[in-house]
Amino acid sequence: MIKKSAAILAGGKSSRMNYRNKAFLKYEEDYFIERIIKALKDYEEIIIISNNPEEYKEFGLKVFKDIYPSQGPLSGIHSALNHIKNDYCLVVACDMPFINKDVVNYLGNIKEDYEILIPKFQERLQPLCAIYKKSCKDIMEKELINNSNKLIKTCFKFSMKVVEEFPFIEKVHKKEIKNFYNINTVDEYEDLIKKKEI
């Protein structure tokens, strides 16, 4: 058991997905959110951040709303850090159907000498599959109050540990390398269900 919390950001309906809730898109018989919950099962606590908590009752998890709504993923992370019981929280977006248990467990077992532990994949930081220290919430709140809600910009206000290598990644099935891919548009989703490469 990983003594950290995990939070799934399920912000709601996306304009680029014709206002469908991406958490409830299906892939291989499961909703995206079901696939993510399965991948996070070794974390001590799993919560969901959503402004529509009634949609998630079937999962038996605690659901919390944004404290500062309509300010994007930074608001969701801030809310998660205010509600978790542990000192660290893995944050995962609900539109990442390839989240892999081995990857998130590897992140969860890295020594806690950071405020943010953030993977880097294909030369891009991945703040929506990253671990945040609970104490980050105070600076995040100041940013939200000032309507400065750019997530990456805010991340640079903290001590970040960047993870670029996953020693086991070449040993697993090719699809696991897609761990950090997210599905944003109708076309991307249609390609996914047709089993095309993303």
From Swiss-Prot:
Domains as described in the record: The N-terminal domain determines nucleotide recognition and specific binding, while the C-terminal domain determines the specific binding to the target protein.
GO biological process, alphabetically ordered: Mo-molybdopterin cofactor biosynthetic process
Binding positions (GTP): L9, A10, G11, K22, D66, D95
Enzyme Commission no: 2.7.7.77
Organism of derivation: Clostridium perfringens (strain 13 / Type A)
Function in brief: Transfers a GMP moiety from GTP to Mo-molybdopterin (Mo-MPT) cofactor (Moco or molybdenum cofactor) to form Mo-molybdopterin guanine dinucleotide (Mo-MGD) cofactor.
Annotated catalysed reactions: Mo-molybdopterin + GTP + H(+) = Mo-molybdopterin guanine dinucleotide + diphosphate
Gene Ontology molecular function: any one: GTP binding
Domain of life: Bacteria
Name of a matching Pfam family: NTP_transf_3
UniProt cross-references to InterPro entries, sorted A to Z: MobA-like_NTP_Trfase, Molybde_CF_guanTrfase, Nucleotide-diphossugar_trans
UniProtKB keywords: Cytoplasm, GTP-binding, Magnesium, Metal-binding, Molybdenum cofactor biosynthesis, Nucleotide-binding, Transferase
Cofactor(s) demanded: Mg(2+)
GO cellular component: cytoplasm
Family under the similarity heading: Belongs to the MobA family.
Recorded name of the encoding gene: mobA
Subcellular location: Cytoplasm
Residues that bind Mg(2+): D95
Name used for this protein in its record: Probable molybdenum cofactor guanylyltransferase
